[in-house]
Design a protein with these regions (language model features):
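Extracytoplasmic gate region of multi-pass secondary transporters
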Residues: 36-40, 216-273, 336, 366-367
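Conserved MFS/SLC helix-loop-helix module at the cytosolic interface between two early adjacent transmembrane helices
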Residues: 69-108, 283-286
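Structural signature of the two symmetry-related core transmembrane helices
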Residues: 85-99, 290-305, 384
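Paired small-residue
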Residues: 97, 108-116, 315-323
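Cytoplasmic helix-loop-helix junction between adjacent transmembrane helices
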Residues: 113-150
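Helix-loop-helix hairpin linking two adjacent transmembrane segments in secondary transporters
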Residues: 138, 146-191
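Flexible cytoplasmic inter-helical loops of multi-pass small-molecule transporters
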Residues: 188-210, 406-415
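C-terminal transmembrane helical hairpin of 12-TM major facilitator-type secondary transporters
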Residues: 286-338
Length: 423
C-alpha cells in the first residue's frame, strides 16, 4: 500500500449549476417510465386487461431497459461514446417511442412501444450518474443522490398529471414525451464533462470481465439487487394498492376519488426525491454502508406493515405509503456511488450499466410476483414478500463494509482520501 493522498474539496464554480441542469434533465427524461402505468385503468378498460397484463405495462419497460443496458455494457458504449451525446439521442428516442402510445394501437403494439422506451432509457439513466461524477468527488454521494432523486420525481410525474380532471391517456403520454424531448435538448446543448473525467478506452471484450471479477463490485451489486427486488414492485403496485384501499374504505368512484388516489400515488413516489438528497447527505457523513443498512431495514419493515392499513382511514394509508416511498429509494444512489468506487476509472461506465442491467432484470420477477400473491393472501400480506430483498441486501452490504474496513467516512465531507496501490 502506497502513501495516502488527500485531495482538495470540490471547488469548480459551475458544479452546482451543472448538477441543477442534469437533475432537471433527468427528471424530464425519466417521466416516460410510468406514463402507461399511470393511465393503466383506462388502458385496462380499452383492452380488457388482467392484473398480470397491467403489470406488463411496467415490466416491458424493465425488459427493454435490461436489453439496452446489456447492449451498452457488452459493447462498452458507456465508456466509448460521449455521455452527452448518448443521453441526448436516447432521450429523444424514448420520447418518440412513448408518444406512439397515443396512436390507435393494440395491447401488443403498446408493449412493443414500452420495450422500446425502456431500451432507450438505458442511455439516459446510467450515463447521467457517470456525468455528474465528473463534477464531484468529495460530495459525490450527495450529487448522485440528487440525480436519483430527480429521476424519482420524474417517474412519479405522470401520476401528478393524471390527478388533474380530464387528464386521460393522451395528455399524460404526450406531456411525458415532450418532457423527455426537452431533456435531450438540455443535455445536448448545455452539458460538458467536469474536471474529474473518467478515462476513456477503446472497445474491449474483457471490460465486463474486469468489472465482474472485482469482489467489492459484486458485493455492492448484491446489496443493489436486494434493494431493486423491493423498489420497482413497490412503485408499480403501490398505486393499485392505494386505489383498492380507498375503494374498500368506502369512497365512491368519481373525479374526487381519482384525484386522491393519483395524488397520493404521486406523493408516495415523489417523496423519494427528498429521500435521495437526505440519503446522499447522510452517506457522505456517516458512511454509505451505514445509510444503506438503515434504509433497507426501514423499507423492509414498511413493506410488511403497509398491508395492515388496507381499507383503513386514508390518512393512515398515506402515512405508511409516504414512509415506504421515502425509505425504499433513500439508499439507491449510494449503490451507484459504491460501484464507481469499486472498479478502475476506465470501467466506471460499464460497471454502472452492468449493475443496472442485472438489477432491472430482477425487477421483472418481483413485479410479476405481487398479483398472484395478492390473489392468494390479499393486500394485507401481499407486499410482505418484498422484505426478502432488504434482508439479503443488508447481508451483502455488511460483508462489503467488512471487506473494505469502512463503516463511516474517515474524513469530513469536503475531503477525499485516495489510497495509491503499489504497482
Amino acid at each position: 500500500m502506497g502513501p495516502i493522498v488527500t485531495e482538495s474539496p470540490d471547488t469548480h464554480p459551475r458544479r452546482w449549476q451543472v448538477l441543477a441542469l442534469l437533475a432537471v434533465a433527468e427528471l424530464l427524461g425519466m417521466s416516460v417510465w410510468f406514463a402507461a402505468s399511470a393511465v393503466a385503468p383506462q388502458l385496462a378498460v380499452r383492452w380488457s386487461l388482467s392484473p398480470s397484463e397491467i403489470g406488463w405495462l411496467t415490466t416491458s419497460v424493465q425488459l427493454g431497459f435490461v436489453v439496452g443496458t446489456a447492449a451498452l455494457a457488452i459493447l462498452n458504449l458507456a465508456d466509448i461514446v460521449p455521455s452527452r451525446a448518448l443521453f441526448a439521442v436516447a432521450a429523444l428516442i424514448a420520447a418518440c417511442a412513448n408518444a406512439a402510445l397515443v396512436l390507435p394501437t393494440t395491447y401488443g403494439f403498446a408493449l412493443a412501444c414500452r420495450i422500446a422506451t425502456g431500451f432507450a432509457l438505458a442511455g439516459v439513466y446510467p450515463p447521467a450518474m457517470k456525468m455528474i461524477a465528473t463534477w464531484f468527488r468529495a460530495r459525490r454521494g450527495l450529487a448522485v443522490g440528487a440525480i436519483v432523486g430527480a429521476l424519482t420525481v420524474g417517474k412519479a410525474t405522470p401520476y401528478l398529471v393524471h390527478a388533474f380532471p380530464g387528464a386521460g391517456v393522451r395528455p399524460v403520454v404526450l406531456i411525458a414525451s415532450a418532457a423527455a424531448a426537452t431533456a435531450a435538448v438540455l443535455v445536448g446543448v448545455g452539458y460538458r464533462d467536469g474536471p474529474y473525467p473518467f478515462a476513456s478506452r477503446r472497445f474491449s471484450w474483457g471490460l465486463v470481465g474486469t468489472v465482474v471479477s472485482a469482489r467489492p463490485w459484486r458485493l455492492a451489486v448484491g446489496g443493489y439487487l436486494g434493494h431493486m427486488f423491493e423498489l420497482y414492485s413497490a412503485w408499480t403496485w403501490l398505486p393499485v394498492f392505494v386505489a383498492a384501499s380507498v375503494a374498500a374504505h368506502g369512497l365512491p368512484p368519481g373525479p374526487r376519488t381519482t384525484a386522491i388516489t393519483n395524488g397520493l400515488s404521486f406523493a408516495a413516489i415523489a417523496v423519494g426525491g427528498v429521500a435521495c438528497l437526505w440519503g446522499g447527505w447522510i452517506a457522505d457523513r456517516r458512511g454509505r454502508e451505514w445509510l444503506v443498512t438503515v434504509a433497507l431495514a426501514a423499507s423492509g419493515t414498511c413493506s410488511i406493515l403497509i398491508g395492515f392499513s388496507f381499507g383503513k382511514a386514508t390518512w393512515l394509508v398515506a402515512t405508511l405509503a409516504l414512509l415506504w416511498g421515502f425509505f425504499v429509494i433513500a439508499d439507491s444512489a449510494q449503490f451507484s456511488v459504491l460501484v464507481t468506487e469499486s472498479v478502475p476509472s476506465h470501467a466506471v461506465g460499464t460497471a454502472l450499466t452492468v449493475q443496472t442491467s442485472v438489477g432491472f432484470l430482477l425487477t421483472m420477477v418481483s413485479i410479476q410476483l405481487i398479483p398472484p400473491i395478492e390473489r392468494l393472501v390479499g393486500w394485507r400480506w401481499a407486499f410482505s414478500v418484498l422484505a426478502i430483498g432488504p434482508v439479503f441486501g443488508i447481508a451483502a452490504v455488511r460483508r462489503l463494509a467488512a471487506l473494505t474496513g469502512r463503516t463511516r467516512p474517515s474524513t469530513g465531507p469536503d475531503t477525499v482520501v485516495v489510497r495509491e496501490r503499489t504497482r
